[in-house]
Amino acid sequence: MMYGYITLPDDTGIAHSEMKPDGSVKVYFEKPVEGGFHSAVCWLPAYRWESIVGFFEDDIRSLDKILHDNAHLILEFSQEGGFENASGY
């Protein structure tokens, strides 16, 4: 299952999976563009990027910084059923 985390000002959406038994969490990035989407996956806590489609190197660097700044929250929420469950909303 994937849980919505945040939508950035440029409409890039960030979602994450539940924590897997090995402690990993899949973080998915998707940005709508004309004719489709740019997308990428990064696995926490290793910060291993894969399946990058449409994003440029500079984009990934920016997303990586955002991910580093938010990883502690994403890892916590991944164990709580996403932000909505963790926050009690």
Give residue ranges: language-model regions:
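Acidic, low-complexity intrinsically disordered segments
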Residues: 53-89
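Intrinsically disordered, low-complexity segments enriched in polar/charged residues with Gly/Pro
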Residues: 3-4, 28-29, 61
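A short, structured beta-strand/loop element
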Residues: 15-56
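Compositionally biased, intrinsically disordered low-complexity segments
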Residues: 9, 17, 28-30, 69, ...
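Alpha-helical membrane insertion/targeting regions
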Residues: 2, 35-44, 82-89
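Negatively charged, low-complexity tracts enriched in Asp/Glu with abundant Ser/Thr
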Residues: 1-16
